[in-house]
Each structure stands twice: as structure tokens, then as C-alpha cells.
């Protein structure tokens, strides 16, 4: 399933591993999302949900310090028959949420394409919510 709301998060060229920008805000309900100062990005893995909390300033610049994450019911061994996903979700700042072809995607910076492929296969959905 594609993303719930049409957010577009793109990386900052100055600091691609820690900063994201919300360049497009949804016009459909809930309207509170547009005014939220703190949002949560939920990465939903098989048997695992990771909530990444980000703060937005007036310019819609967002950051997520490593450690601002909540791991729930994580069983990373179920993500892949070949490898565990735990090594790919150890730092929230490594994950870059984005929309491609109308669907939510998450990617990591500074990793090999094979790692990205495994990471994408492990993530089943990404949700954006106002906090």
C-alpha cells in the first residue's frame, strides 16, 4: 500500500544523513499534520514497528537525532531469509524517507545497492502522523 498522505521528504545536501525537508504538505485531513511541530515516521517491518520522531521548525526543516526512536515487537530475523535486518535499522539518521512513483520508500545513505535492496524488502510500509 502506498503512503497514507502525500508528504514528500527529501534529503538535505548539506547533511544528508541527519536532515530531511518536508517539501509538500497534505491538503486533505487531518489538517493538523500541516501545523504539527513534531511528527512520527513509522517504519513498519515484518513483526516490527519503528517510530522515528522528528521536529519541524518554521521552515519545515526536520531532523531526527539518533536515539529518538522506539522499537516495538522487533524480530528482525523474520525480515529476510538470508540476513537479519537489525544491522540496517540501528541508526534512525541512516534512513531517508521519500516518495517514489506515488508510494512511500525508505533508503539509507552511504550503503551499497545490495544493502538498499534488502532494506527495501524488509520495510512493508511507512506512515506519517502528527504528534
UniProtKB/Swiss-Prot annotation:
**Source domain of life:** Eukaryota
Q: What else is known?
A: Almost completely overlaps MET2.
Q: What's the protein name?
A: Putative uncharacterized protein YNL276C
